[in-house]
């Protein structure tokens, strides 16, 4: 049918955020619905924080299939849901809501999207591996928790705000079987840990457009071809951090893959169908190129 033929049987899902005008999700999901000939549509909703509770009630009242949730609602939405999956509870944020026969269930597909990107795009299995995480904000939390739930052996977290890094390490220790510890920002210990880690994840905004020359303090000289280096930034697609890692021979992955697979997972939670990943990837690349 395609998403343009709206009728009485059309299933509606969408995005709750404030703002939402910048989102790539509508183009990505609607292209996927068209590809699979599903009578579904994805609509962005600009939801003021004061109206969030009413908007969530609207998912049930309007019989929507579900929504994505973006800033500033990812934490605030949690009390209004009937159920949370374990990862969302540990991360402390929800980015996908599924209307399961009137029960609103909160998921976090950000971290799962990153891990699926690792396995699908970089052929990297976190089971039994070790990682360094730079940053301790929302995206960093999602990635760290999901890596731990996926069997990561050890994670070292460094962040300018030391307390946030310590809190994240503590949450991982309490909720998973992964060993987690904080390393002070810019500390020499980071270089020493490089010999034992397999994965480096840059999860700060440093290097994001337009400040493309910014880069976190990091012992690049310790990188080798054995390391996989990821930057969660996708604009620009090749950050200064990734370019410096490539110059050391390390394998690299940018943030587009995580953005793609968090959407893929949300699509599959709502529809029950296997997402057309290539179609979604192509649309996403075009959207990012357009800015």
UniProtKB/Swiss-Prot annotation:
The keyword Transmembrane helix does not apply. Pfam families: SDH_C (PF18317), Shikimate_DH (PF01488), Shikimate_dh_N (PF08501). Keywords: Amino-acid biosynthesis, Aromatic amino acid biosynthesis, NADP, Oxidoreductase. InterPro entries: Aminoacid_DH-like_N_sf, NAD(P)-bd_dom_sf, SDH_C, Shikimate_DH, Shikimate_DH-bd_N, Shikimate_DH_fam, Shikm_DH/Glu-tRNA_Rdtase. It comes from the Bacteria. Coiled coil: none annotated. NADP(+) binds at residues 135-139, 232, 255. The active site is at 74 (proton acceptor). It catalyses: shikimate + NADP(+) = 3-dehydroshikimate + NADPH + H(+). Shikimate binds at residues 23-25, 70, 95, 110, 234. Gene3D superfamilies: Leucine Dehydrogenase, chain A, domain 1, NAD(P)-binding Rossmann-like Domain. GO terms for molecular function: NADP binding; shikimate 3-dehydrogenase (NADP+) activity. The keyword NADP applies. It is an enzyme of class 1 (oxidoreductase). Belongs to the shikimate dehydrogenase family. Involved in the biosynthesis of the chorismate, which leads to the biosynthesis of aromatic amino acids. Catalyzes the reversible NADPH linked reduction of 3-dehydroshikimate (DHSA) to yield shikimate (SA). Homodimer. This is Shikimate dehydrogenase (NADP(+)). It comes from Desulforamulus reducens (strain ATCC BAA-1160 / DSM 100696 / MI-1) (Desulfotomaculum reducens). The gene is aroE.
């Amino acid at each position: 049918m395609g998403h343009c033929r709206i009728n009485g049987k059309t299933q509606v899902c969408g995005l709750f955020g404030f703002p939402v005008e910048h989102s790539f999700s509508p183009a990505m999901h609607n292209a996927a619905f068209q590809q699979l000939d599903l009578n579904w549509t994805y609509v962005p909703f600009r939801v003021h924080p004061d109206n969030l509770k009413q908007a969530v009630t609207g998912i049930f009242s309007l019989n929507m299939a579900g929504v994505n949730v973006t800033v500033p609602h990812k934490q605030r939405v949690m009390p209004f849901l009937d159920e949370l999956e374990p990862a969302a509870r540990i991360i402390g944020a929800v980015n996908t809501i599924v209307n399961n026969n009137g029960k609103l269930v909160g998921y976090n597909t950000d971290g799962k999207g990153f891990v699926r990107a690792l396995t699908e795009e970089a052929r990297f299995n976190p089971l039994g591996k070790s990682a360094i995480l730079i940053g301790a904000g929302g995206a960093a939390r999602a990635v760290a928790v999901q890596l731990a739930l996926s069997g990561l052996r050890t994670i070292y977290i460094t962040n300018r705000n030391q307390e946030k890094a310590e809190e994240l390490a503590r949450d991982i220790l309490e909720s998973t079987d992964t060993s987690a510890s904080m390393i002070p920002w810019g500390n020499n210990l980071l270089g020493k840990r490089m010999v034992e880690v397999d994965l480096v994840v840059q999860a700060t905004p440093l290097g994001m457009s337009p400040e493309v020359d910014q880069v976190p303090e990091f012992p690049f000289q310790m990188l080798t071809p054995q390391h996989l280096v990821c930057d969660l930034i996708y604009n620009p697609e090749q950050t200064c951090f990734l370019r410096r890692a490539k110059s050391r021979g390390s394998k690299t992955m940018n943030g587009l893959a995580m953005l793609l697979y968090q959407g893929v997972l949300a699509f599959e939670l709502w529809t029950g169908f296997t997402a057309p990943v290539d179609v979604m990837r192509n649309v996403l690349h075009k959207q990012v190129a357009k800015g």
